[in-house]
Curated annotation (Swiss-Prot):
GO terms for biological process: L-proline biosynthetic process. Pathway: Amino-acid biosynthesis; L-proline biosynthesis; L-glutamate 5-semialdehyde from L-glutamate: step 1/2. This is Glutamate 5-kinase. Residues 281-358 form the PUA domain. The gene is proB. PANTHER family: GLUTAMATE 5-KINASE, ISOPENTENYL PHOSPHATE KINASE.
Amino acid sequence: MTRPHLKKFRRIVVKVGSSLLIDSAAGKVRGEWLSALAADIAGLHGDGCDVLVVSSGAVALGRSKLKLPRGPLKLEESQAAAAVGQIALARIWSKVLADHGIGAGQILVTWQDTEERRRYLNARSTIAKLLEWRAVPVINENDTVATNEIRYGDNDRLAARVATMASADLLILLSDIDGLYDAPPHLNPDAKLITVVKRVTADIEAMAGSAASELSRGGMRTKIEAAKIATTAGTHMLIASGTIEHPLRAIMDGGPCTWFLTPANPVTARKRWIAGSLEPRGTLAIDAGAVAALRAGKSLLPAGVTRIDGHFARGDAVIVRGPNGHEIGRGLVAYDAADADRIKGRSSSDAAQLLGVRGRVEMIHRDDLVVGGPLGDSA
């Protein structure tokens, strides 16, 4: 199967591991390498691609700055090292991207931020706004309060969750290895690189090794887990070596890597999840004008909503019904039941004033809406 080209993707998440970012022997950031990576990111950004960075390294950078001895750290030591490292890490990314005229915005997340719906929606909205402003979100694990990320190396899976949250169509995991091999390459000189994986099977999972460096605890196994998360959500993923300068350019030039492909795309995968995997918590009744708007691919605005039923929180799944009670579709509602009831039937400007917010108010954004319920047409 032919491997895709990076320039076909419009939203890319690049994950950078600690062992790439930090020169452990010298105890400092690999400045020239990071500048080269920033140049690669700037090239994609200049072509109109949205780029997000998920950067490990807070703990590693903190322990370097604090001159902590080699070897395992206790949990509280790792968290304290992260507190020092996060400040330095944000400053470094801001500088290398500013050298190319690109703004950066730091977002600190934990695994729980991608799982708990309200926090998920807040983080997703922040990412969307930064991308709208053409800034590069630099997303770091909040190691000062997280525990599993530090102990178990969940950063690859966190990157996959971020890619899902951002509706990215590609996740790139830069590593200290070219990709997935059919045997451990450091033990078997005849090991072959798997260039394309169309589906993560038990055989593929069995190929994943568990070795990891001192600074980066995520081995190949967590990368395979990340691939399962990403491809299920409609995001392609690739693993490539980041040890060389200009690693993204090397991928574009046909350098070695492993692609994990998916037949879906983020929007269709997300809508399939909304339609079939979530238990609805309430119902929104809408008028005929809103039905026509939804069928034309528009978002659901408060003005078209006539009744609110149920007790739901922001981000919960709800059923949308037309004037005759038939199901029009399902979606993730942007407001809890109380606020939704306050703004139903109102213009967007009136709704914004009632809620004390600025900008356009949407009851359900079109990306969070699946039109065409199991009960058929309704208006």
